[in-house]
C-alpha cells in the first residue's frame, strides 16, 4: 500500500480541492423557438442561433 511521506496541511488540501467546485450550466433561450438550451449547443428541436441546422425525426409514441 502507498504511504504518504509527510502529512498534508489544510492549506495544501484546500489548494488541491479549489478546482473541484461545481458550477451551474449557462442557459440561453433560442430566439426562434423560445426553447431553453445550454449555451453553444443545438436545441432539442434542431435550432442553433435561430437557424434550423439538424432535421429531427418525429418521435414514435406507442399507444396501448
Curated annotation (Swiss-Prot):
Q: Which InterPro entries match?
A: Ribosomal_bL32, Ribosomal_bL32_bact, Ribosomal_zn-bd
Lineage in the entry?
Answer: Bacteria, Pseudomonadati, Pseudomonadota, Gammaproteobacteria, Lysobacterales
Question: Residues annotated as region Disordered?
Answer: 1-28
Any one Gene Ontology BP term: translation
Molecular-function GO terms, alphabetical: structural constituent of ribosome
What are the record's GO terms for cellular component? large ribosomal subunit
Q: Which NCBIfam families match?
A: rpmF_bact (TIGR01031)
Domain of life where this protein originates: Bacteria
Annotated organism of origin: Xylella fastidiosa (strain 9a5c)
Q: Which family would the database say this protein is a member of?
A: Belongs to the bacterial ribosomal protein bL32 family.
Keywords of the record, alphabetical order, are:
Ribonucleoprotein, Ribosomal protein
The protein in question is named: Large ribosomal subunit protein bL32
PANTHER family assigned: 50S RIBOSOMAL PROTEIN L32 (PTHR35534), LARGE RIBOSOMAL SUBUNIT PROTEIN BL32 (PTHR35534:SF1)
Amino acid at each position: 500500500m502507498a504511504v504518504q511521506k509527510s502529512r498534508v496541511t489544510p492549506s495544501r488540501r484546500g489548494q488541491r480541492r479549489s478546482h473541484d467546485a461545481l458550477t451551474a450550466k449557462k442557459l440561453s433561450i433560442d430566439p426562434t423557438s423560445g426553447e431553453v438550451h445550454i449555451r453553444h449547443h443545438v436545441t432539442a428541436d434542431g435550432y442553433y442561433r435561430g437557424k434550423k441546422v439538424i432535421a429531427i425525426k418525429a418521435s414514435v409514441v406507442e399507444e396501448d
